[in-house]
Regions:
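Structured aminoacyl-transfer and RNA-binding surfaces used for tRNA recognition/handling
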Residues: 1-176
């Protein structure tokens, strides 16, 4: 599948599930001195994740252009790039992590028709301040991911970009 087709199918799937498509924000963030570039899909949405009302509603979907330089030494291996597009579906207080996992699973298994036995998941493994994300692990197991295909890692934690701000554990999907 080519990238254009994947983008289109992702946006269409979430539109079908009552999400509004929003445009990719600028690669140079407005009014944010903490970063040089937009580094993640959620970066332009931080004010809305903090409670500000988004003009398009509480369910959003986008394909955000991103540039990262923090791990520039690793660019060129099999997993790191400087520029990439991040597919994102966003619930601004509309649905919970369990529903987000269900949407992700349905998209990759039913829409993309990926082999579920080749899906691997990473979850936040916990640290001294925040415990392991057992909730995400539970939802992935309920969706049908085998226990031995779920890995807890320490760096599955987003933000904050500065001293404070939205942050928390994340989960990622891999295919091999």
């Amino acid at each position: 599948m080519k990238a254009d087709k994947l983008r289109q199918e992702f946006l269409e799937y979430f539109k079908k599930n009552k999400h509004e498509v929003i445009a990719s924000a600028s690669l140079i963030p407005d009014n944010d001195p903490t970063v040089l570039f937009t580094t993640a899909g959620m970066h332009p949405l931080v004010p809305f994740l903090m409670g500000e009302k988004h003009p398009c509603g509480t369910r959003l979907v986008n394909v955000q252009k991103c540039i990262r330089t923090g791990d520039i030494e690793e660019v060129g291996d099999t997993t790191h790039h400087t520029f990439f597009e991040m597919l994102g579906n966003w619930s601004l207080g509309d649905y919970d992590e369990e529903q987000a996992v269900k949407y992700s699973w349905e998209f990759i298994i039913k829409e993309l028709k990926l082999d579920k036995n080749k899906i691997a998941i990473s979850i936040f493994g916990g640290n001294d301040d925040v415990p392991k994300d057992t909730e995400a692990e539970k939802y992935w197991l309920e969706a049908g991911v085998a226990q031995d295909r779920i890995t807890a890692v320490l760096d599955n934690f987003w933000g904050p970009a500065g001293q404070t701000g939205p942050c928390g554990p994340d989960t990622e999907i891999f295919y091999w």
